[in-house]
């Protein structure tokens, strides 16, 4: 699987992800880009789960963003509706973490849209490790969102065998 973490602090939101692609117990690729910018670089998105499934979701989510003129919440809710009702989408195994200047959201494989507490998202196999590290850093340091995301992803990569140290980090300042 993978680890994706999103942190929001001081007019900055960051989504960071590792690059490991695993097939069973085998590492197939170590430098996959699981975080990207969408909708005129105004939305950040990261995925955890099956790579092919995630690319399908990225394409569909970007189409929803275009349809709803970049309105993140509306696009996420419409994506979730499709996810629940479409026979193909229902079989996709992936999670999306998405963020813009106003909101941070998780779109789940069940078609749920969750706005997390404290604007902190951590998903994937190393998500609990990254969330723990990011929470501690948010509560006890003055580090930037980018520094917290990077450090928490490093900690997750040190602990989780399905997370490596190759990082893709995208940042929005607003």
UniProtKB/Swiss-Prot annotation:
InterPro entries: ATP-dep_Prtase_HsIV_su, Ntn_hydrolases_N, Proteasome_sua/b, Proteasome_suB-type. NCBIfam families: ATP_dep_HslV (TIGR03692), PRK05456.1 (NF003964). GO terms for molecular function: metal ion binding; threonine-type endopeptidase activity. Its EC number is 3.4.25.2. This is ATP-dependent protease subunit HslV. Protease subunit of a proteasome-like degradation complex believed to be a general protein degrading machinery. Belongs to the peptidase T1B family. HslV subfamily. Allosterically activated by HslU binding. HAMAP family: HslV. Na(+) binds at residues 157, 160, 163. The active site is at residue 2.
């Amino acid at each position: 699987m993978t680890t994706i973490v999103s942190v929001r602090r001081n007019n900055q939101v960051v989504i960071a992800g590792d690059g490991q692609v695993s097939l069973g117990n085998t590492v197939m690729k170590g430098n996959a880009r699981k975080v990207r910018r969408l909708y005129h670089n105004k939305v950040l998105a990261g995925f955890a789960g099956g790579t092919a499934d995630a690319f399908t979701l990225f394409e569909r989510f970007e189409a929803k963003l275009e349809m709803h003129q970049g309105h993140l919440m509306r696009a996420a809710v419409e994506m979730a509706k499709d996810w629940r009702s479409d026979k193909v989408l229902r079989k996709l195994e992936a999670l999306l973490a998405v963020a813009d200047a106003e909101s941070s959201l998780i779109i789940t494989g069940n078609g749920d849209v969750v706005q997390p507490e404290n604007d902190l998202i951590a998903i994937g196999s190393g998500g609990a490790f990254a969330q723990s590290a990011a929470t501690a850093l948010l509560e006890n340091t003055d580090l930037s969102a980018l520094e917290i995301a990077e450090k928490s992803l490093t900690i997750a990569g040190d602990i989780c065998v399905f997370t490596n140290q190759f990082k893709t980090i995208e940042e929005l300042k607003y």
